[in-house]
């Protein structure tokens, strides 16, 4: 995996050409994806061009190699957490999103009570689903805007921390996540993979349980698409050394 310093030396491309390439269904090189993500995160690519590229990805998809490069580049847009000094098993659970889904709020402290350590970086509302961060912020005084140092300190003290993407932690996902929310590209399988896995790998965890929703309250209403997402999340995540278990659960009615 390249260093952040190497990422800053990414060669330049013409954004319109990259949009045309993906619109035609062609595969991006790793260098092209590095340029796209790094330049957008730094504000060098405007929202309207990034939105066009996201829509091209939404229609044409990405190969596993492209998705791996997407995850890696988003991950390296910021710092990653070093929890290697914590000897307990470090795990997390992530849901792909549904209506009324509050499982993380209950499951995380239960996992800690069972002896695990849970460093959880979550997202905000996306599409019609409510985000874990939004739910946490409804609790008076709950701070989800944690620096890397604050996040690690909470994990060390309590075995659990819950926060969001920041300027330090996966800033590329924070920007792209917000743009996907307003460009009708929330249900793109490779973009979902990039968002979820970049956050989870940045946590420094050993294992991840993925709750892939299916049904009319999920991003992917079709079971076969949900199965495809679960398989790609597992394939790409395991290439980064994560132990992953994916379960597909029904989202045809609100949870709780």
Please report, for each region that a protein language model flagged, where it lies by residue.
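Acidic, glycine/proline-rich low-complexity segments that act as flexible tails and inter-domain linkers
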Residues: 2-100
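Electropositive phosphate-/nucleotide-binding environments in soluble metabolic enzymes
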Residues: 12, 27-34, 44-48, 61-68, ...
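A glycine-rich phosphate/pyrophosphate-binding beta-strand-loop-alpha-helix module
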Residues: 31, 54, 102-152, 156, ...
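Glycine-rich phosphate/pyrophosphate-binding loop regions near the starts of catalytic domains
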Residues: 89-121, 181-190
């Amino acid at each position: 995996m390249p260093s952040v310093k190497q990422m800053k030396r990414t060669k330049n491309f013409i954004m319109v050409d990259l949009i045309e390439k993906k619109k035609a269904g062609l595969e991006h090189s790793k260098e092209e994806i590095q340029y796209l993500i790094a330049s957008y995160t730094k504000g060098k690519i405007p929202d309207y061009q990034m939105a066009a590229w996201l829509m091209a990805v939404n229609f044409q998809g990405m190969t596993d190699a492209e998705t791996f490069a997407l995850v890696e580049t988003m991950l390296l847009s910021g710092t990653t957490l070093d929890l290697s000094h914590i000897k307990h098993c470090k795990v997390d659970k992530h849901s792909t999103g549904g209506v009324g889904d509050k499982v993380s709020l209950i499951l995380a402290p239960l996992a800690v009570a069972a002896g695990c350590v849970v460093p959880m970086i979550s997202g905000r509302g996306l599409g019609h689903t409510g985000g874990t961060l939004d739910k946490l912020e409804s609790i008076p005084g709950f701070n989800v805007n944690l620096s890397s140092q604050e996040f690690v300190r909470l994990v060390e003290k309590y075995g659990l921390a819950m926060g969001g993407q920041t300027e330090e932690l996966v800033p590329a996902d924070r920007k792209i996540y917000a743009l996907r929310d307003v460009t009708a590209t929330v249900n793109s399988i490779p973009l979902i993979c990039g968002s979820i896995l970049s956050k989870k790998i940045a946590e420094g965890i050993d294992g991840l349980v993925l709750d892939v929703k299916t049904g009319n309250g999920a991003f992917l209403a079709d079971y076969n698409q949900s199965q495809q997402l679960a398989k790609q999340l597992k394939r790409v995540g395991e290439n980064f050394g994560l132990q992953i278990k994916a379960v597909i659960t029904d989202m045809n009615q609100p949870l709780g």
